[in-house]
Amino acid sequence: MTQTAEKPFGKLRSFLWPIHMHELKKVLPMFLMFFCISFNYTILRDTKDTLIVTAPGSGAEAIPFIKLWLVVPSAVVFMLIYAKLSNILNKQALFFAVLSPFVVFFALFPVVIYPCRHILHPTAFADTLQSILPSGFMGFIAMLRNWTFAVFYVLSELWGSVMLSLMFWGFANEITKISEAKRFYALFGVGANVALLISGPAIIWSSKLRASLGEGVDPWGVSLYFLMAMFLCSCAIIAACYWWMNRYVLTDPRFYNPAELKAKKSKPKMSMGESFSYLLRSPYMLLLALLVICYGICINLVEVTWKSQLKMQFPNPNDYSAFMGNFSFWTGVVSVFVMLFIGGNVIRRFGWLTGALVTPIMVLVTGAVFFALVIFRDHATGLVAALGTTPLMLAVVVGAIQNILSKSTKYALFDATKEMAYIPLDQEQKVKGKAAIDVVAARFGKSGGSLIQQGLLVVCGSIGAMTPFLAVALFAIIMVWLTSATKLNKLFLAASAAKEQELAEAAAAEKEASSAAKESAPAIEGVS
C-alpha cells in the first residue's frame, strides 16, 4: 500500500502517533537507535562532569580549558579522519568504524584505565607546575594532572556531535522521505526526552551502590563499571538496529528508493572562511548566528559556576553523580511538559518574537537569581533560615532549576523559532545559511564561553573571585541576544510578508491561467 492511498489520521492520532502500521518496521529501529544514542549521551555527560569536577586537584575550572584546548582540536581532527574514511569505506562500514573507538575506550576505562590512574597520571609533575604557575592556571594543571579523565571528557563531548548530529541525523536524512520526516522526527524528539527520564534513575541507582559494598572497595570505580556496562549495552543495540535497517528496511522499496531521495538537496560543505564571508554578507544570517552564539556562551558561563558550587556541596563522586542523575531526570520531565503544552502555544498565540525572547529572558532572570545567591550568600541568612537549608545548597538547587528551565525553553522555543527563521528564505539562503551557522555559530557558542572564563580565571585566580565578572558578562551577552532577536524579528516579518505576497501572486497567476484555459476550451471546440 502506498503512502498516498492510506487513510488520513484522526486529530488525536495525528497528534499522538501519526504512524501507519506497516511503517513500524522503519520507525521503531530508528526510534530505538535515537533513544539509545540519547541515553548514552546523558550517561556520558553526567559521568564526564563527575570525573573532572571531583578529581584530585581538579574542579569546575578545568572544564573551560578542556573544551577550548582539547575538545575543539579533537573535533577538527575527527572531521579530517572522517572525511578520509568516507572516501575509502562504504556507509555501513563507516558507521561501525566511527562507533568502534567509543566502544573500545569506554570498555577499557572502568576495567583498565581508571584502576591504573595513579600510574598514568603525572601527579608529581602537576604538583611542580602548581608551585610555579599562578593560581589562575589551576584549571590547565588539573587537565594535565587528570589527563585520562580529560580524554574521557573529550570523547563524551564528541559522542553528542558525532553519533547524534552526524551519524544518526545523517543516516535519517538520507533514508527518510520529506513526507515521513514531518511525522517521524517529532517522535524522535520525544524519544530523546524519554531517554532522560530513564537514564537519570539509572545514574542514581549506580551511584548509590556503595551502600552495599564492603570495606576497601572503591565505590566510584564500581559505579563506573555499571555505567559503562549500560553504555556498551546501548551501543550493541545501536549497532544491531543499524545492521537490521540496512538488511531489512533499505532493501524494501516501500521505505527506501535511492532515485527518489536523490532529489533532496544536500547541505553544502563550507569552510570556516567561507562561512564567515557568507554570514557577514547577510544581516539576516548574522543575526540568526548571534542568537546561537549567545545561547552557547550564556549556558557555558552559568554551568561552570554552578558545577563549582555543586562540587563544594557534593565532593564525593557518588553523591555528585547521584545529584546529576536527578538533574537529568527532572530536565526530561520539564522538557516534555514544556514541549507538549507550552512551546507551540506560545508561538501560535503571541508570535515569533515572543517565542524567541522567552529563552534569553528565562536565562537572564534565573541566572540573575543564581549569581545573586552565589555573590551575596552571606547576606541571605533570613531567606536561608526560612527555607531550612544552607546558602550553598540553596545556590546548588537554584542553579539546577536555572539549567533545567533554560534547557527546556531552549528545546521547546529557541530551537523552534530558530528553524522557523529559515522558512521565508529562498532555497540557496536556507541551505548555505544553515551550513554557515552550523560551522561558525556552533563552534563559537561552545568555545566563546570557555575563552571568557579562561581569561577571567588567569586574572582573578579562582571561580569564586571571577563570579561577579561572569554575572556582568552574562548580562551583556543577553542584551546582545535580546537586541539581535528584536532586529531579526523585523527582518523575519518583512521576509514572511514578501514570501506570502509572492505565493499569493503565484496562486493568482495560476488561477488566471486556469480560467483563461477554460474560456478558450469552448472556442477551440467550435472551431473543430
From Swiss-Prot:
Membrane topology: Multi-pass membrane protein
PANTHER family (alphabetical): ADP,ATP CARRIER PROTEIN 1 (PTHR31187:SF1), PTHR31187
Gene of this entry: tlcA
Subcellular location, record wording: Cell membrane
Segments traversing the membrane: 24-44, 63-83, 93-113, 124-144, 149-169, 184-204, 220-240, 284-304, 327-347, 356-376, 381-401, 463-483
Record-given protein name: ADP,ATP carrier protein 1
Main location per the UniProt record: membrane
Organism superkingdom: Bacteria
Disulfide cross-links: none
GO molecular function: ATP binding; ATP:ADP antiporter activity
Keyword flag Cell membrane: yes
Family: Belongs to the ADP/ATP translocase tlc family.
GO cellular component, as recorded: plasma membrane
Annotated coiled-coil segments of the chain: none
Lineage of origin: Bacteria, Pseudomonadati, Chlamydiota, Chlamydiia, Chlamydiales
Keyword field: ATP-binding, Cell membrane, Membrane, Nucleotide-binding, Transmembrane, Transmembrane helix, Transport
Transport is among the record's keywords: yes
